[in-house]
Amino acid sequence: LASSAASDVYKRQKEEVAYQDGQIVSKTLAQNDAVSVTLFSFAKGEEISTHASGGDAFVTCLDGVGEVTIDGEKFQLTEGQSIVMPAGHPHAVYGKEQFKMLLVVVF
């Protein structure tokens, strides 16, 4: 039962942000001084350029194929895979294909 409930939440998250040609779409689920939780959808070829964050960022791929670059090293993410982008380290996110992700930043 717990697995089924988790699966339902995961499916609903994927449906919260639609793909739009040539765009990155985001939806903030929660934000305060300690944490930020945001859903993103990337059209193929769209990118959030290199920047650094003041908090540790945890990314989970919800759909598609994305590429995360951290300190110049590239990592490919597919559905269900996650990665941590450490605070203060330069990173970028790119939609190799259409790509949806959940971003949790802890400050």
Question: What label would you give each PLM region?
Answer:
Residues 1-6, 10:
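Single conserved hydrophobic/aromatic residue that forms the stacking wall/gate
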Residues 15-46, 104-107:
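A short glycine-rich, His/Asp/Glu-containing loop-to-beta-strand
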Residues 41, 54-68:
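Short, conserved beta-strand element in jelly-roll/cupin
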Residues 62-63, 78-79, 97:
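A cytosolic small-molecule/anion-sensing beta-strand core signal
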Residues 72-87:
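Short acidic-glycine-tyrosine-enriched beta hairpin
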Residues 87-107:
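Ligand-binding loop in jelly-roll beta-barrel domains
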